[in-house]
Structure formats: C-alpha cells, structure tokens
Amino acid sequence: MSKPTHISYNSIEQYRNQLRDLKQAKKKQVFNIPDEVEFIGTIKLHGTNCSVCYSNSTGMYCQSRNNIINLTYDNQGFCMLVEKNKRNFENFFQILAKKYDINLDIYTLSIYGEWCGERIQKGVALMRLPKCFCIFDCKVTNQNDKDFVSYWLDVSFKDNDTCVIASPTEKIYNIYDFETFKITITIDNYSDSQQKLTELTEYVEKCCPFAKKLGVEGTGEGIVWRCCYGDNQRWIFKTKGEEHKVSKEKVLIPVDTEKVENIKQFVDNTCTKNRFEQALEYIYKINPDSPLYQQTPKMKDVQYIINWIRDDILKEEKDTILENNITTRDIIPEISKKVVDMFKTCL
C-alpha cells in the first residue's frame, strides 16, 4: 500500500476576484469563453471542510482541510462517521470510477463536503441539526505525476430525483438534493449581476434552505457559485450574507476593490469580529493540528490568533491592499493591536 497524501480543497475566492480573473482570461483568449456565462449556485454550509479519498494503492482515508485524519486524530467525529459508513463510501468511489472511466490504479478520487451540525459552528440554523456530511465536489488527481492537471467530476447526477452519491438515512447528503440557483453573468459588465446575487444571498441568509428541508429554520451563510469549462475545470466564487462576512464593505456583493482613506480604516474594515471569531473557531475547535486544539483560550496564545487573522487578511484582501498602495509593514502592527484588544474582551 502507498502512503496517503493530503489532497487539499482550493480556497474559494470572492466574486470580485474570480470574475476579474475570468474577464482577463477572456481578453487573453486563454479559453473559449462566451460573452455570457451561466453559474450554478449551491447553498454554502457553515461547518468544516472534510473529505474522503480513495485509490487502489492507498485505500480509503479521511482528511480535514489541512491534514490527514483518522479515528485517533479525528475532526469532531468525522472519521467515525466514515468508518461506520465504509461500504457506502466504497460504493460511491466505484460508482464515480465506472461512470467517468477512472482507473483507480492510477488516479485518486477525493470526495469533498461540509461536516456540519451541532457544536461544529455557531450562528447558523445548522447548529440545531445532528451532525451530518454534505457532499459537494469530487476531484481527480494523480499523485505520481507532478505534471497532471487535477480536474473535477459532477456529483449531481440523480436516480429517481435523488442524487446517487448520497445516503440520507445515514446523514450523508448531497448539496444538489437541496435548492440550487442559476445566474447568467455578462463578462464585460458583471456589475449587472450584482443585484440578483445580493437578493439570492440575502434569501439564503434569512432562512437556510438546507436546514429548512431538514426541519429547522434559521440563518444561512451564503451561496457557492460554479461554472465548468474546458476539460472539467471550473470557475468558482462565494457570496456571503452580512452576518457571515469577515470584511466590512459598503455593499453586500462588491464588484470592485474599495478605496480606503488610511491604514486604520483598512484594519477596521478587515479585522472584524466575524474574522476574529472565525480564527478562534479554527484554532481552538476545528483544526486538530493546531497546538491549541481543544484548549481554553489564554492571553499567551494571542500570537497564534494574530498570525491567523493576518494571513487570512493578506490572502482575502490582496487586491484591496495593492489598489490602495498599502504595505504589509503598514498594516500588521495595527492588526496586532486590534486583535489583542478583542482577545482581552473574550477571556
């Protein structure tokens, strides 16, 4: 048997970033991109990213977003769910391999989804549901070929109006069995789609359709939008409701980077309570690889929080930083100061 390798799920960009890249690709004629592109939206669930991978050489193994996990080194019980449903997952892999002609002696299939429900995340209707795994993607990789370009498989195919890659009785769902959305975006004038994106995102935030179908009403997080092109590649972005946005912006779904008057305004806009709480969740509750996992927060831990928030801001707000000619040297001291103040109030 070969040693399993962690196969990460890509970070999902914001609307303004992904659509800017799409517009540039169209200009450069990198791909045959039409003037109007249809995106399919699925409900964004507020939990923790997990996955199950399989090839004939590695066998089946589990992952959190950043680590390979197992029954000893688990992520809030996810591996236990997979172990109890081993036959179901083995069946999923065989169905996908047969449908898409995937040679599992060569390739690895990774089924990605959101592990969500009680005690995993707060502030959403999902917290009142039993823990469940909701599948939303499957990726094909070749771990022995560094030049191989990974690609995505459609997991939405159905039999009798129910997704095949799911086992609802075991609380293994498929996001395509729940409400989905469509929007057509004009590449050269994608601000035209801003209002509809805002309306749909607010609709999901007001009452999560996933939770509602399972019998609970309450706040949702947002929508993930996908458009496939070429050889099973895709464009993907997210839109979040106001309660779950980690940056303050003048509009819910911005299409351009915002101008800021000074460093303090940038830090106030980006080093928010939501981003701070997201850091605490990840460092203390979600990531078993964190040295502070399942520990009680203490003031001496603050540098871990600062580092996480700093890195997240630099990743998510790179375009705003460049647009406003801000340097990391300018913002890091202000971020650190604000994080320390917020951390003191939660101890």
Residue ranges and their predicted role:
Residues 1-347:
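Core nucleotide-handling region used for phosphoryl-transfer chemistry
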